[in-house]
C-alpha cells in the first residue's frame, strides 16, 4: 500500500468522494509523472541536440507542474467541490497526453523520453479512472 493510500485510510474525517484506491492511484501517478517529467527535461538539457528538444523540455516542465499541483490538491481532502477536482484532473489528463505524444516522438533516440512517455501514459490512465468515479 502506498503512503497516499495510507493517508487516505487514516484520515480522521469520514470524507465522501472518489473510491480511496482509485484516488490513491491517481495521487501516486501524478507525483511519479511530475518527478519523471522533471528528470526527462533535465536529461534533454544534457543532450547534444538540446535545441531540437526545446519543445519537449517545455512540455515536460509544464506537465511536471500540473501533475505536482494535481497530486497536491487530490491529497488535501478538505472540501473541494467535485467540479473543481474534475476540472483539475481533466487539465492533468490533457497535459499528460500532450507530453506523452511529444516524448514518444523522441523515444527511439532518447531512452529517457520513452520512460517519460510511459509515466505520462500511466498518469493518463489513472486520471481517466479517477474521472469515472467523480
Where are these regions (language model features)?
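Amphipathic alpha-helical hairpins
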Residues: 1-134
